[in-house]
Regions:
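Positively charged
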Residues: 2-274
Length: 274
């Protein structure tokens, strides 16, 4: 782990640790110690698994994913069966799954609980406090978080089909990072200042389908907004002002070139012209 310098202690970093949002015990108030280290590299996949992944990436990039329209939520697609390949691992920028539309979940069975459990395991493994499903390559509207960032401490939240109802007028600018924009194997960690409302009201469902209504402030509000952005296909550099964006742009372009090298048949959105 690497702790930020003292002057940055109050900059609550979204996903600054290895794999998610992380806050450790602090002397008082909203002061948090933070680390930017990420997690383990994904296990090598078989040739068949790689072929399936390549096909799925092309389908997502071309908008051909097989999803059903949900009449209750306009053009938002829905899924009645959850499927994924284990073990899950972190999806890195600019993988098109981070920009793809995320389907509403209409099934509340053991598969949903198993998916959430696997996401929590990745989150804790990488010392995070929050994780959204598209960040592990599953394009559904699901997020998990625990503000304490430690298994057995704090409360675990599973939010299904979350909606942002309203946000307060007050905002705060803090440094953020993102597990999808880091690669410990090459010592790459992208961070930048992001302004967000410090209060939000949200509605969602839990893993049983029961309705959840929450008013979140400060740290939890920031966790929720960062993960909710992922469900909207919005990435944290989209929230940066132009000056801050220009600081991280070279590293974003580097990650794009690295991804294209390993996925030559997949088209991605590039920031090179911005």
């Amino acid at each position: 782990m690497r702790q930020l310098p003292l002057q940055h202690i109050r900059q609550l970093c979204c996903v600054p640790f290895r794999g998610g949002l992380k806050a450790t015990s602090a002397p008082s108030g909203n002061a948090y110690s933070m680390c930017r280290n990420f997690g383990r590299k994904a296990a090598l996949q078989s040739t068949v698994a790689q072929a399936r992944k390549s096909l799925m990436l092309r389908e997502l990039a071309s908008g051909k994913a097989d999803l059903k329209e949900d009449d209750d939520e306009g053009s938002t697609p829905s899924v009645s069966k959850l499927e994924w390949e284990s073990p899950l691992d972190i999806v890195r920028y600019p993988d098109p799954r981070l920009r793809a539309k995320n389907a509403r979940i209409s099934v509340f069975d053991e598969s949903l609980k198993h998916l959430a459990a696997e996401m929590f395991e990745i989150m804790y493994r990488d010392e995070g406090v929050g994780l959204a499903a598209p960040q592990v390559g599953v394009n559904v509207r699901l997020m998990v978080y625990n503000p304490e960032g430690e298994k057995g401490k704090g409360r675990e939240w599973i939010l299904v089909n979350p909606r942002l109802i309203s946000s307060g007028k007050g905002t705060e600018t803090m440094e953020e990072g993102c597990l999808s924009f880091q690669d410990a194997s090459i010592d790459l960690y992208i961070r930048g200042d992001v302004s967000r409302p410090n209060t939000v009201r949200i509605k969602a469902q839990d893993e049983t389908g029961a309705k959840v209504c929450l008013s979140l402030t400060d740290w939890q509000a920031r966790i929720f907004q960062h993960e909710y952005d992922h469900l909207q296909g919005t990435l944290f550099h989209d929230r940066m002002n132009q000056e801050e964006f220009q600081k991280v742009k070279p590293e974003l372009v580097f990650m794009e070139k690295l991804f294209e090298k390993h996925n030559p048949d997949v088209q991605v959105q590039s920031v090179s012209q911005q």
